[in-house]
Amino acid sequence: MIHSHFFAHLSRLKLINRWPLMRNVRTENVSEHSLQVAMVAHALALIKNARFAGNLNPERIALMAVYHDASEVLTGDLPTPVKYYNAQIAHEYKKIEKIAQHKLIEMLPEELRSAYAPLIDEHQHSEAETAIVKQADALCAYLKCLEELSAGNNEFLTAKARLEKTLAQRRSQEMDYFMEVFVPSFSLSLDEISQESL
């Protein structure tokens, strides 16, 4: 039987810190971020289906979100200002991500590749699925900014402003719902969210 390094690689996502050029009150790794993106993407898909006549598979979208940054175990987490410095760098980095996604898929035993490829290879996602995962990704980065700012870390002010523009570009009814219903709690203390829950 062959051995696969696929999950050994993925387990190292917890060693890759996000926001590497910024001071963080609490560091966030890619593994944690991926879990939060999966939870938010799942919620966005459910909201779209329940409130706005969507026809998405929330569980599939959650799994796509789990793997949305998996290629970073091979590429690292390139800071956003570098990744999008200009169109040429952004284009070349997309090509690198695609190669890394395919390398991850090739690490799997042959009989599992067809099951994982649609989750890891973003080119196999529908436009609607991609939109939900990208919304969730931006929302989670925005929530990180809110948490850092609530802890007194003004290092995240510019990132928050940039992400507000990104969220406006990716705006949808399900995102508006999520922002209105769930996001305000992220600026509250544990005591405040605990009191309202009782």
From Swiss-Prot:
| Record-level Gene Ontology MF annotations | 5'-deoxynucleotidase activity; metal ion binding; nucleotide binding
Give the reaction(s) catalysed: a 2'-deoxyribonucleoside 5'-phosphate + H2O = a 2'-deoxyribonucleoside + phosphate
**What UniProt keywords are attached to this protein's entry?**
Cytoplasm, Hydrolase, Metal-binding, Nucleotide-binding
Site, as annotated: Appears to be important in orienting the phosphate for catalysis: 18
| Domain HD intervals | 30-142
Residues involved in substrate binding = 18-19, 33, 69, 77-80, 137
- Name the predominant localization: cytoplasm
Entry keyword Cytoplasm:
yes
- The catalytic activity of this protein is classed by the Enzyme Commission as 3.1.3.89
Known PROSITE patterns for this protein? Answer: HD
Q: Where in the cell is it found?
A: Cytoplasm
UniProt superkingdom? Bacteria
**One Gene Ontology CC term in the entry:** cytoplasm
Identify the stretch annotated as signal peptide in this record: none
Statement: the UniProt record of this protein carries the keyword Cytoplasm: yes
- Cofactors, names only: a divalent metal cation
Q: Where does a divalent metal cation bind?
A: 33, 68-69, 137
The record's HAMAP family line, in alphabetical order, gives: 5DNU (MF_01100)
Q: How does it assemble?
A: Homodimer.
- NCBIfam families on file: PRK03826.1 (NF003009)
Tell me, in a sentence or two, what this protein's role is: Catalyzes the strictly specific dephosphorylation of 2'-deoxyribonucleoside 5'-monophosphates.
Which family, according to the similarity comment?
Answer: Belongs to the 5DNU family.
Q: What is this protein called?
A: 5'-deoxynucleotidase ETA_12010
This protein's species is Erwinia tasmaniensis (strain DSM 17950 / CFBP 7177 / CIP 109463 / NCPPB 4357 / Et1/99)
| Lineage, uppermost ranks | Bacteria, Pseudomonadati, Pseudomonadota, Gammaproteobacteria, Enterobacterales
